[in-house]
Amino acid sequence: MTDVVLRTHSLVKRFGGITATNNVSLEVTRGARHALIGPNGAGKTTLINQLTGVMPPTSGRVELLGEDITALAPHKRVALGLVRTFQINQLFNTLTPLQSLAVAVSSRHDAARRWWQPLGRDATIAAECEGLLEQFRLTEHADRATKELPYGKRRLLEIALAVALKPKVLLLDEPAAGVPAAERADILATVAALPADVSVLLIEHDMDLVFSFANRITVLVNGGVLTEGPPDAIAADPEVKAVYLGQTEPAHG
């Protein structure tokens, strides 16, 4: 039986008379590369905000590793292994990538409480930061101010910071948004290569990226789940073509 690491039960979010998410039940399995797609206004980011605790649901439940986390604050969900990135970068622009990673890694080791010691001085923390810089191809940019990095590198840094927190489930909200086309596939390939014990839930509008990345896809329309399945089944689904992809056959078949 496949392990479920993240599960929602009938999540509903209403804003007055508007239902943004409508009885959304979703399962993300261990090691999954799972994509959440849908047209603008489908409720994707609202759903992610409920998963991470930024926005409480009107009704329903969120479970992480079998534990009900519906009422937990965002930082407590992060501590349990539910980590996200944002559609708009959330970075320390005046710090270097090395310094930023030292902050993230140190916070996990509780070293940030030892404020009188330089961040990253600990050999274990320094080695982990160096490993992350190499993994995300940021080594040559390690000592540049983040605000000076090319945009694609800033995107990679944000994902590296999330990975530094040792997520069990990584939620990526359009990680390739604004990135030059030539660099988008590289970003998703880096994410796909994360260890198998890291489950990924991806929101992305670029269908070529989605179908090359995901082993399971959930389609959200008007706040509810239209369908879910493997990429081939989603690509062939006539309702998905009509509502989201249009009538043209996707290039990926």
How should each PLM-predicted stretch be described?
Residues T2-G253:
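Glycine-rich phosphate-binding loops of nucleotide-dependent enzymes
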